[in-house]
Amino acid sequence: MSRDLNDLLTQSEETVQALIADGAETELLYEIEHHLASQDFTKLEKAAVELVKQGYHVDDADEFEDERGKRWFAFMAVTDAELDNDILNRQVREIAAIADECEVEYDGWGTLIEDEELDDEDLDDGEE
């Protein structure tokens, strides 16, 4: 049910490369958010339980409608990790296997990179 594992692994490696190219430091821990969704809340809940057993923090599910008006439920499975292809590929494989077992969609992962160099002057809107 999830995207093809090879596509997910390629996307993961490309994401790591892009983050590093943008200045992300590989030795820091980042909050990695893996995205899962299903139209069947019970199946999504089963995936959440399995991911918690594997050590992931699972957010409450959000409900949304797709462009066709179909109702979906989604959550993020969160963990801290370095921007390391081996670590992240292991997570992708693990989560994709759980998603397939539970018949839910896994769409890969993302993270936020905070720019510590931003200060109050950078955020000034020009009004004084």
Swiss-Prot record:
Protein's UniProt keywords contain Cytoplasm: yes
Keyword rRNA processing: no
GO cellular component, one term: cytoplasm
Gene3D superfamilies per record: RraB-like (3.30.70.970)
Residue intervals passing through the bilayer: none
Assembly and binders: Interacts with the C-terminal region of Rne.
The protein's name in its UniProt record: Regulator of ribonuclease activity B
Organism encoding this protein: Idiomarina loihiensis (strain ATCC BAA-735 / DSM 15497 / L2-TR)
